[in-house]
Curated annotation (Swiss-Prot):
Modification N-acetylserine, positions: 2
GO biological process: reciprocal meiotic recombination
Quaternary structure (record): Heterodimer with PSMC3IP/HOP2. MND1-PSMC3IP interacts with DMC1 and RAD51 and binds preferentially to dsDNA.
Subcellular compartments: Nucleus
Family annotation (Pfam families): LZ3wCH, Mnd1
SUPFAM superfamilies: Winged helix' DNA-binding domain (SSF46785)
Family per similarity comment: Belongs to the MND1 family.
GO MF terms held by the record: double-stranded DNA binding
Protein name: Meiotic nuclear division protein 1 homolog
Function: Required for proper homologous chromosome pairing and efficient cross-over and intragenic recombination during meiosis. Stimulates both DMC1- and RAD51-mediated homologous strand assimilation, which is required for the resolution of meiotic double-strand breaks.
Coiled-coil residue windows: 83-173
Superkingdom classification of source: Eukaryota
Organism, as annotated: Bos taurus
GO cellular component: nucleus
Amino acid sequence: MSKKKGLSAEEKRTRMMEIFYETKDVFQLKDMEKIAPKEKGITTMSVKEVLQSLVDDGMVDCERIGTSNYYWAFPSKALHARKRKLEVLDSQLSEGNQKYANLQKSIEKAKVGRHETEERTMLAKELSSLRDQREQLKAEVEKYRECDPQVVEEIRQANQVAKEAANRWTDNIFAIKSWAKRKFGFEENKIDKNFGIPEDFDYID
């Protein structure tokens, strides 16, 4: 019997985002450490690392209230975060391609000489390093595209979807505010300040 293959880092990230989208709830780390292994097959030991990577990439929001951190995710925000990441990676890849082309030209000029020169050796090393960097960037671009093959098209067509999602989350936020007032006795303006909720926060028409 073959050994069961573990989840890749990207699979863990995708499955953890599914928890937020499917439940539309707010979690503490200890909640995720119970739910993620049971429902998504993410090992308990890796939950904190995966969750932090999603926070770092802007896919998941985190707010500290009292002594605890609370985590939640907005569907529309995730789409825009992926779009921004793709734009950055595409820009870096484009710059890398231009540098690569310029170095190729420089090496061709260096080859005209009859003997190996120090300049040619240096250019060859730089070209090799740049080639490796370019391949890494290409791989990362593809990773983000593979995470959701239709992400670019979704972003173009997401206005209505994002509006509906935002209004659903508006419901959730109002529910969370009510819960926080009951649970912690917080005043509404303090909750708004902690969560960065603007005074004119309301449903989108």
